[in-house]
Amino acid sequence: MSEEDPKACAEPEEPKAGPPPEKTSDWYRVSEDLPARFNNPAWFRGYRTKEPPSVYRTSNQAYGSRAPTVHEMPKVFYPNSYKFSRQVAVGGMFQNNTLNVYMEKSIVTGPDNYITSYDRLNFHPSYRVCRPSICD
């Protein structure tokens, strides 16, 4: 018992650090104003680790379950201008308050026929109980 167990006295080894995550700028020439999230694809989290049953797996699930790589990240960033949104916020969206008095034409019945409220049962020329309109 006077002899100490060498395993018990040894300090636990620290886990070795892996290689740093790849950056898009390591592989491609990127724009200077590229946001940091696009230069570091390893920052994206929340990708699926649990596999769903293969019977119900779709191609979108297969594509969306993988985290992006440096080859799929954008190299240039074009920020959107909010000029239109600021103008709409000041004046509001355009509102059309006119009354629609045009009788609507149906795509089903063709350009010659109009859908009317009083002709509910025979709105289509071929919709007849006794025989189709081809027999006329």
From Swiss-Prot:
Residues 1-16 have a biased composition (Basic and acidic residues). The keyword Cytoplasm applies. Residues 1-27 are annotated as: Disordered. One of its GO terms (biological process) is DNA damage response. It is found in: Cytoplasm, Cytoskeleton, Cilium axoneme; Cytoplasm, Cytoskeleton, Flagellum axoneme. One of its GO terms (cellular component) is axonemal A tubule inner sheath. Microtubule inner protein component of sperm flagellar doublet microtubules. Interacts with CFAP53, ODAD1 and ODAD3; the interactions link the outer dynein arms docking complex (ODA-DC) to the internal microtubule inner proteins (MIP) in cilium axoneme. This is Piercer of microtubule wall 1 protein.
